[in-house]
């Protein structure tokens, strides 16, 4: 198989695994997964709000998932690890699933979208964008965006800093797509910088003083006089 075809096949396999886990672990608060190849096989890390449901009684569920990944999706020697999501409000996939569930239960899309945005920002996110698209109020499709804070749309930070989630709400008029994008707190943005105060000559000279000569009496010592001495005095000492 050519290298290009191999990359495409790996990408398609990852998307299929993502969809399968999202469908099977919906009750567990599925929050995404990482798939990493190792010399011993494939490490699959599942993030969930309720890890106990992912593992199952006696590990039954996780064994079934391992078998499905190996046989149905061709994942080489899958080793599943389950991690609990510390703050579900800062997980884009979990919030997208919650928003889709609220729309299916009959919530008005503006109320559901703004409530989701407010909950994410109140949890400390640097920025968030919620996009709801589909037949929201009538027969014609439309797109509604809710944005607050700082969010990146291009460049490498989109892949490294922005957490993305997607879900679908099924209603009588048709399906509604939900996208949630957020930047978690503490993210180091490339265009962020801090301006520090200028260092005066007196402060710079104070930083060079490491000891007080023994011939000086501490009570009569004039630090300002020592600090303001020329540089050649410091070198002679």
UniProtKB/Swiss-Prot annotation:
Xref: SUPFAM superfamilies: Prokaryotic type KH domain (KH-domain type II), Ribosomal protein S3 C-terminal domain
Domain of life: Archaea
Coiled-coil region(s): none
Role summary: Binds the lower part of the 30S subunit head.
Location of the KH type-2 domain: 17-86
GO annotation (BP), single: translation
Database matches in NCBIfam families: PRK04191.1 (NF003219), uS3_euk_arch (TIGR01008)
Species of provenance: Methanospirillum hungatei JF-1 (strain ATCC 27890 / DSM 864 / NBRC 100397 / JF-1)
A single Gene Ontology CC term: cytosolic small ribosomal subunit
Assigned protein family: Belongs to the universal ribosomal protein uS3 family.
Record carries keyword NAD: no
Pfam family of the protein (one): Ribosomal_S3_C
Keyword Lyase on entry: no
GO MF annotations, alphabetized: rRNA binding; structural constituent of ribosome
Quaternary organization: Part of the 30S ribosomal subunit.
Keywords: Ribonucleoprotein, Ribosomal protein, RNA-binding, rRNA-binding
Protein name listed in UniProt: Small ribosomal subunit protein uS3
PANTHER family: 30S/40S RIBOSOMAL PROTEIN S3, SMALL RIBOSOMAL SUBUNIT PROTEIN US3
Record-linked InterPro entries: KH_dom, KH_dom-like_a/b, KH_dom_type_2, KH_sf_prok-type, Ribosomal_S3_C_sf, Ribosomal_uS3_arc, Ribosomal_uS3_C, Ribosomal_uS3_euk/arc
């Amino acid at each position: 198989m050519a290298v290009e075809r191999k990359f495409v096949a790996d990408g398609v396999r990852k998307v299929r695994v993502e969809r399968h886990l999202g469908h099977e672990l919906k009750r567990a608060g599925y929050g995404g997964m990482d798939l990493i190849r190792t010399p011993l096989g494939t490490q699959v890390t599942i993030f969930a709000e309720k890890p106990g449901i992912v593992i199952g009684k006696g590990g039954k569920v996780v064994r079934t998932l391992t078998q499905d990944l190996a046989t149905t999706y061709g994942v080489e020697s899958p080793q599943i690890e389950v991690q609990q999501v510390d703050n579900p409000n800062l997980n884009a996939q979990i919030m997208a699933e919650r928003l889709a569930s609220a729309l299916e239960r009959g919530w008005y899309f503006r109320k559901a979208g703004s409530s989701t945005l407010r909950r994410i920002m109140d949890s400390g996110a640097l920025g968030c964008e919620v996009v709801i698209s589909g037949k929201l109020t009538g027969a014609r499709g439309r797109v509604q965006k809710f944005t607050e804070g700082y969010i990146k749309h291009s460049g490498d930070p989109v892949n490294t800093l922005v957490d993305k989630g997607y879900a679908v709400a099924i209603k009588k008029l048709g399906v509604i797509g939900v996208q949630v994008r957020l930047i978690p707190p503490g993210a180091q943005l490339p265009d962020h910088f801090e301006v520090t105060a200028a260092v005066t000559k007196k402060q710079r000279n104070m930083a060079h003083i490491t000891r007080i000569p023994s011939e000086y009496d501490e009570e009569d010592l004039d630090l300002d006089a020592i600090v303001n001495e020329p540089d050649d005095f410091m070198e002679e000492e």
